[in-house]
A protein has these predicted regions:
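Extracytoplasmic/secreted cell-surface and envelope-processing proteins
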Residues: 62-63, 143-152, 183-188, 211
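Catalytic His-Asp segment of secreted/periplasmic serine-dependent ester chemistry enzymes
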Residues: 179-258
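Active-site segments of SGNH/GDSL-like serine hydrolases
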Residues: 136-143, 162-192, 196
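Boundary at the C-terminal end of the N-terminal hydrophobic targeting segment
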Residues: 25-26
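Bacterial N-terminal signal peptides
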Residues: 8-18
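Charged helix-capping and loop-helix junction motifs
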Residues: 151-160
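N-terminal secretory signal peptides that target proteins for export/translocation
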Residues: 1-4
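Conserved SGNH/GDSL esterase-like catalytic core that processes O-acyl groups on lipids
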Residues: 33-53, 61-149
Length: 258
């Protein structure tokens, strides 16, 4: 049953990769078409979760890159597909909802690096048309440090526009997490943009402060950049923080405890 569930998730993912700079030119990889939606409406509490979209970077999804010793096609640097945060969190959602949601995951490192030069409507055409019920935004690490007021404004404005475009397509619940490699300037601006868009911001800075959450603490890697990504423990912890945010959003205000 577990294997079948993971197969459904894998088939449901429409993958579009943007490789890390050290891995060479950008590459497109298309998987099988998404599986048909569940027969019944899926909900976690009050939160609809029929369609779930993950927008991230290499922590969310990275294709094989033999030059740096990475052979997976999932979130770097989990030891297996089912151990990255996307799949761990999807399993939690499916268990709570009583069915497997339709899932898309996309690496949008190109947005991180180009910000306002990235055409969101064209670059995320398929993802916008997907009209997800729940969107997890997990980016920031590939954006340059915000060394000037101009850079800070550009980053915030670009992030505002990204979230606004996502909100224009359907009526998604937005959850944005801070960076695994914490950066206060970027994290503060992502938080404000998220709150302005009516989303939930998840501070995961404590995860990157714990060496045990890094893949290098679990096994050896040829490339320091790969080793610096979350390992299985870090992925589990990241999923746990996001799941707590989902549960909070899923609880109607009228029944929340003070």
């Amino acid at each position: 049953m577990v294997c079948r569930a993971w197969l459904q998730v894998a088939l449901a993912m429409v993958v579009s990769l943007v490789m890390l700079p050290e891995c060479g030119a950008a590459e497109q990889l298309d998987s099988a078409r998404p599986v048909a939606p569940a027969a019944k409406e899926l909900r976690v509490g009050a939160l609809r979760v029929d369609r779930v979209l993950f927008l991230g970077n290499s922590i969310t999804l990275h294709g094989p890159a033999p030059k740096i010793g990475w052979t997976g096609n999932w979130g770097m640097a989990a030891s297996a597909l089912e151990k990255d945060y996307v799949h761990v969190l999807t399993a939690q959602i499916a268990k709570a909802a009583g069915g497997m949601p339709e899932v898309k995951a996309k690496n949008i490192a190109d947005f991180e690096r180009n910000l306002d030069a990235f055409n969101v409507t064209e670059g995320l055409k398929d993802e916008l048309e997907f009209q997800a019920d729940l969107i997890i935004v997990a980016i920031g690490e590939n954006s340059a440090a915000l060394a000037t007021d101009e850079a800070k404004l550009r980053f915030k404005t670009s992030f505002d526009k990204l979230l606004a475009e996502l909100k224009r397509h359907g009526d998604p619940t937005l959850i944005v997490r801070s960076q695994f490699w914490a950066d206060a300037a970027k994290d503060e601006r992502m938080k404000q943009a998220c709150l302005d868009a009516g989303g939930t911001f998840v501070d995961i800075s404590k995860l990157g402060a714990d060496e045990a959450n890094f893949a290098r603490s679990e096994r050896k890697f040829e490339h320091a950049g790969v080793a610096g990504h979350p390992g299985d423990k870090g992925m589990q912890a990241l999923s746990g923080e996001l799941w707590k945010a989902i549960q909070k959003r899923a609880t109607p205000e009228s029944v929340k405890q003070d």
